[in-house]
UniProtKB/Swiss-Prot annotation:
Native source organism of the sequence: Methanocaldococcus jannaschii (strain ATCC 43067 / DSM 2661 / JAL-1 / JCM 10045 / NBRC 100440) (Methanococcus jannaschii)
Cofactor(s), names only, from the UniProt record: Mg(2+)
UniProt binding sites for 5-phospho-alpha-D-ribose 1-diphosphate: 90-91, 94, 116-124
Gene3D superfamilies reported for this sequence: 3.40.50.2020
GO biological process terms held by the UniProt record: 'de novo' UMP biosynthetic process; pyrimidine nucleobase biosynthetic process; UMP biosynthetic process
Descriptive protein name: Orotate phosphoribosyltransferase
One example GO MF annotation: orotate phosphoribosyltransferase activity
Domain of life: Archaea
Length: 176
């Protein structure tokens, strides 16, 4: 079994997709919810996700960024497996100390790959792209564990960023 099929099976096994009435981070209503925390707190899934992304960036001179809180475990796994420096993008700057919005060393011209847990419209990850770019980083790629196929890919393309989903919601909903 290839790694993608294994990931799909594991996501289903731990109950990452739930049905009912839900309000998403984007404000949209949905009849299903991707409970990705069931994956990002599972060591087997986290390692597998880290390996899949690390394989795709191993030959690139990049830093790996995760947006607090959901994608930080993923970014950490990728960083360790790929041996790439880690950045953490805060949603709001700290109100004490350095007041940084980006943790880790980001220098002008650094190439950064962002990892995300779930995308719907891409709004959250677009804020991270903007923040990294405003601080001198170059972002043209975002990896996401699950894409809900509701506009994130298109919205990121408008900003010259490629969205690379490990799994789409269609694949997760299919009954293999």
């Amino acid at each position: 079994m290839d790694k993608k099929s294994k990931l799909i099976n594991l996501l289903k096994e731990v109950g990452c997709i739930r049905f009912g009435e839900f309000i998403l981070a984007s404000g949209k209503k949905s009849n299903y919810y991707i409970d990705i925390k069931k994956a990002t707190t599972n060591p087997e899934i986290l390692k597998l996700v880290g390996e899949i992304i690390a394989e795709q960036i191993k030959d690139e001179d990049v830093k790996v960024a995760g947006v607090e809180l959901g994608s930080v475990p993923i970014a950490t796994a990728v960083s360790i497996i790929a041996q790439k420096p880690l950045l953490i993008v805060r949603k709001k700057p700290k109100d004490y100390g350095t007041k940084n919005k980006i943790e880790g060393e980001l220098k002008e011209g650094d190439k950064v790959v962002i990892v995300e847990d779930v995308t719907t419209t891409g709004g959250s990850v677009l804020k991270a792209v903007k923040e990294i770019r405003e601080n001198g980083g170059i972002v043209d790629k975002v990896f996401v564990v699950v894409d809900r196929l509701e506009g994130a890919k298109e919205n990121l393309q408008k900003e010259n960023v490629e969205l690379i989903p490990l799994v789409t919601v269609k694949e997760l909903q299919s009954t293999q």
